[in-house]
């Protein structure tokens, strides 16, 4: 970043290897540290690539690749995404207009991991989503959109199914989620940042169904994360 003349402090940069939940867990960390006055702005991003021989062999051995051997596998992908998170004061001083507000975030740890014999009832995902939506009035503050890393693996889908049973009252339609892995494959550690991009662009381009979006991710190591975004929907002249 110094070579590109970006105002980023290399000495304060940190790298985390937390899988799919990396970015949203860093949102949670940044939100808390910024509230404590430690930082005014954080650049948070995720980079992922499954396209290495050892990684592909590992996925194939565990029957996680979508194909004739496993119909409940996923399509691997690679990508990157970054988000600039700032306090309202810092954004105002920089002359920037935020395109979304991080209303709340939460993390939890699942002990019943994928590729084990233990039954997973979505306890950690339920915990993280419940904590994220805790400040909403379910009767009027509905969540309009859901972006998640459901990727075709039954384990992931079942987690959200149990969450729907517990927290359906907060959503317009808890089963009407957007799972971008259907289109671009599983983006792994880049997922959270890319979901932010999808949610904010839907609002900016006028096709979002409302201003509130829940983002959630699930890592193989048990980390579960959720974030509630609010972005004003700009009416589109091309949509009635």
Task: List PLM regions with ranges.
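Short glycine/threonine-rich loop-to-helix capping motif typified by GTGT followed
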Residues: 114-118, 151-166, 187-191, 227
